[in-house]
Amino acid sequence: MDAIHPVSLRNSKRHPLLHSERNLSRRAVSPSISRSFFQHSNGSFPLFQNHRKSLPSAIYKSVDPYVDANPLDPLAAAKASFADFPEQDDSQSSTSPLSSKYHTKKNKQIFVEDSRRGGAASNAAAIAAKKSGYYERTSTRKRSLTVPTPRTSFPHHPRSRRFSLKNAAIATSYHKFKPLSSNSLSSSGMHFSASKQAFNSPLLQTFSPSPSVSPFSNPAVEKLKTSASKQAAEAQSLREFDFFTPTPEPSDKNLEKLKNGASKQASESQSLKNMESLSLARSSPILTSEKLKNGASKQAIESPPFRASEPLPSSNIIPNPAMERLKNGASKLAIESQPFKSAEPLSSAIPLPNPMSEKMRNGASKQAIMAQSSKINPLPPLTASISDPSFEKLKNTASKQAIESQSLMNSGPELLEPSISDPMLEKMKTDAGKQTVESLSLKSSDATIPKPSVSDLGVEKLKNDASKCAVESQSLMINDPSVSSTSFYNPNMEKLKNGAIKQAIEHQALNAAILNKTQLPYFHQSSSELPISASKRAALSQQTESASKSSSNISEMCDSHPPSNFSISASQQASKDRFSEATSSIDLDLSPGRSLSLASSKLSVKEAGARVYNRSVATPVMTPSNPFEISKSASQLASIAQVPVSEPAKTSEVNLKKSLSLASSKLSFQEAGTSLKEKTANVQHSPEVLNDRSLASLSASRHADAISSKSKQHTEIAQPAFNTTGTVLMKTKSNLSDSALSTPQHSDSVLFDITSKAARLASTCAKTDLHRKPRRKHKSFTLENYFGHNAEDESPQSDEVESQTPPSGYSENDIGGTDIYPFALQGAALAAAKDFSRREASLSDSQSAASMDMLPMKKKLSHSSASSTRSIKSLLTNANQKHIHSSINETDDIPTMAAHIVATGQKNKEKAPSFSNDQALDHLLGSAHKRIPSNKTEWSSSSLHIPSHNSFSDIHHRKIAAHAAAITAASEKLTPSIEETSYSSSKAHDASLSAATLVANKDKLIHAPTPQVLAPVLPKVSLPHRHSVSLGQIRGESEVEGDVFYDAPSDKEDLGSSNAPLDVPHGANRSSMDEVNGSKYDYSDGILDGSGQYTDSDMSDDENSLKDSQSSVLSFSAVPTKVLKFKLRDVLGSEYSPSPQLLASSSDVSGSSSAVRAAMKADKIFPAVHENPPPLKTKQSIAKPSPHTLRVPQKKHKHFYHRDDGKYKSGTNLRKSETVDLPQFFIDENRRKLYEGLWAANKGYLLSKSEYSKPNDLICNIVVRELWSRSGAPTSVLAKIYDLVDRHHTGVLGRDEFIVGMFLIDQYLKGRKLPLKVPDSVWLSSKRMGDMLWRLEKLQKKTDNKKPFFKKKKKKRKHLKKFFDFNTTAKVNEGAMTD
């Protein structure tokens, strides 16, 4: 039970203490009080602990509850009830009044005698409270106060007397001060913690030993939720319960949040005067005014602090230049008329404060810091000057003119010390005000006195002008000579938002450097560019000698910083260029803490990018412990390539250390890619420099990829970096020396890691939405432009930079409009087989190869698609041609290995094979190439360098590499959860694939017959007999732009289960038995032995015919062959070979996934060997019934009748109904209501009014997908239905569109085909009056098609009439002749 208070339950809501009135019982008073009432703030009231000891002995003896207790006097009753408390020891005083001590029978006898007197006192206090008017009654339901009776379970509970005291105290206070008025406790809804303090404070003050001191004289009251109500409660409690000491008048009546800047300024200036000024000001009370609504009262409150202060001399009056627009004109004039005491300059012995100790949030404090910095750090023979650099636009012309006139009056010829220099006045709307301010600056500036003036290039518009004036006045008062020992401290400092304020702080540091001669001495520039006064330039030039002497000390200070601090920002570098050093002997490379930053504007970024090269060459830096500890951002590593290498041994180390960062902007990335491309041409580099350059290009491509994925407009930034990446990686391998590769520090594993990362980043960029949108056809796109070489050129390209250049008609602004596939994806698959495609063109006739390059794009693709059908035998016959391998170099091994690493599942680390990358590469190369090293050395995991060898595997290796990258991209896109088999490192398995075995069988492999070259390596693969929808059809239908069904979970069902071999029959589980010896691997329906031979136990005759074809691309992957074969059969199989027009101009390819595009691109441009699919089994014809057992079905007799045109027509055809099937092209009323109910229950969900005008009439596409997917239809079918009904293409469906879509799903589930276009009758029947409208339309069509029968009868009658007329004339003629 919650707290019970002697207030009628009817009016309990008006009492602020009773927050739990919903749990009150019907009894008005109860002697037991719940635990939550006393322990609301994790502790009981201090009033009820050791209460007997806390009372003075005189008070305790003088109170007699039986004589002095007046039932009509609640105060006396309270004292009597309080005096009857039994004395408790410290051990018995519990923090919880409801302790278990009161519940024991042993302690019940202690309070037998005291409970009688306590009950009488409690009743007396309750009756007194009732008669004093504390209780209120209502007319509807009268509730009287009953005499409290103790509980039966606690008959002698002493808490009833405690409660009587509290009730009496409340009753007394409410009787005298009208507690239920608007200004009382109930009007503000005071929290329970405030009420607890109100009841604790009076008693504590009443019985305190020093009654003259008030505990509420402290002006700094903590921020409460409702400050005014709590202060009122405290003041009221002080007046009521002070029985012995007269309470002084409270100094703070009603504290609120001051919303007016003028009153805040007055209170702040007064508080500062009281704390830090003279004793007269300290003795004055602190005035904290309430919320002012009238300007007159505001003026009256603000005037006392100025009247209390001593009169200031007229020579020290400084105007306040920026006052806010005040709401009340009278108060504004009163505030403006108050003078502020000026600050005399402090001595130079005061230490320099740190103005950036906190983040500045208020712009006013910025100006105060600038004003103070000029006074704190003056030159010894000079005096400081206060500069107000920019007046903001004053909205009120009258107040502006008043301020300007006041400043003109104060700035006379005798006030030369606080001269005001304003170099950049803001443009003012009022011309009169502008002229006045300009005249003020001209009058105040005196060129005869050489004094440094702090210049501000542009201060932002300060939001709170009143607070700015307050801080300015505060800073001026602090700098008073009487309080010169006080250092400046601004508690409201925040983050600087404007670079101009940073520059002002830099000028302050300049003054300190001139004075102390130990600060940053490297600022100098020409007089035309340096934005400081001439006097300061003269002073700066005088200190150059002392600055040069301190350069050695500065260099020693830099050695203490970690290497990570060398990543200096572009703005810092720009600031060094802007304020360069005085002499060339001064070191540039100071720590970031010592460098002063300018604003991160576009101009400074551009200057930093342009000058970082010149600065980085001439500046030495310290040597870090690890060069790779420096953050390898794109701009940092791109700056490495900008430095020309004259001494590779020394400069390459400096390049890594000297990584001054370029800004991450469009210009910097573009310059980084361009400069990297220029610097890598025609330069001989050392291995270390090339490694750094490859890292630089890789990092540049990574960050360019991140930018290009965010916005379409940044694509032109990423393109140069990607082009340079492929160029540097190709040239790195060729330029490295054999001696460098022999060392473990410069091994190929670093390059392999680089290329694998480049391939992964390239494929990631290709999968973004930027590259999925349809491209426009580009006429100038040819293979010659794409590959950058001529097909008939067999020699390698020159040393010039080879890059994947875009077509000639390509423009950076129109990247999305060309018919160019993503360059990143091309770099992953095409660069791996680029050299092979050039060599393979020479296999055919040179004339056909030369003519093929001159053909347009479509014909080239058709030629390559025709060449893709060549078998393995045709390739093996041409393998002995020597001119094919004459120009093969080692530059192609790096992208090839990268493609292989990607193909082994490097991207999905959690599902990758258990062996490492080097082992996987060794295994892959050993199984794919069968290439014999020329130096007869075994391959190892540490050195994976593959020497060239003139064998067929060189060409076949590059072809497989291109397809391996495309296959892996497709497998990751289609089957992300493919279970890859982790081959254990078994001796038998590794021995069969190791280089030692290949070296031993060198002669056998070279002189073996042609069909057996790849026999021991390639496994025998069986193709499952499953006929599914081709992947291209599925993706072509579902992956259109704006498709909400892309990558739906139901796509896995269309492709089959990915956790088991897909040709295993249903119910058969896959059991992979990896034996310890590694001899065989059991896949439940086939066996894969250690040598790679795969034997299918249930192979049919058609599958046995595939044994001769042993050149499967999928056999080189660590994934089980049967899984990948089925997954990628539709992508790479010959049964789905898209036409050249599809690759050239169709939007299906560009709209499909990047994996399908990569596979088809590699398939068409780089021909690969594919297996012929098994012949499809013909359908068995249904056996005819035996003539001996069943009767032959008799045909119905057709009735013919004679027509007018001489032909016969069957009566059966006439009796057939010519009406269409009603349910197929019409939505009946019952189904329409069912669909409409589903639409009404989900409309408007996930839609906002800001995007759509009527969201309640629409249904979101995500909701549509969730609803339609419950039907169980394939995702491709649902996507097609969505395209049929989506007429507006806004991502939402209306009522009619949703109903028609539901109708089409039902028709598909019934087995009907989907229409190419939704008939008009279906759209018409989807409306609420559709049934009636459809029937009317049907009736209209029926009447229109009805033949005019009466015309036929008329014609027939005419024919009969002519016939009868002819007969009658003939008979007449015969009769005449007979006569």
From Swiss-Prot:
GO terms for molecular function, please?
calcium ion binding
Q: What is this protein called?
A: Increased rDNA silencing protein 4 homolog
Q: Which GO terms describe its cellular component?
A: cell division site; cell tip; cytoplasm; cytosol; mitotic spindle; mitotic spindle pole body; nucleus; phagophore assembly site
Compositionally biased residues, Basic residues: 770-780
**Which stretches does UniProt call biased (Polar residues)?**
262-287, 562-573
Residues of the EH domain: 1240-1329
Q: Which residue windows does the record flag with biased composition (Basic and acidic residues)?
A: 250-259
* Keywords carried by this UniProt record: Lipid metabolism
Biological processes per GO annotation: autophagy; lipid metabolic process
Residue runs in coiled coils: none
* Cited function: Positive regulator of phosphatidylinositol 4,5-bisphosphate turnover and negatively regulates signaling through the cell integrity pathway. Involved in rDNA silencing.
Name the domain of life. Answer: Eukaryota
Query: Which residue intervals define the domain EF-hand in the entry?
Result: 1273-1308
Q: Which PROSITE patterns match?
A: EF_HAND_2, EH
**Similarity comment:** Belongs to the IRS4 family.
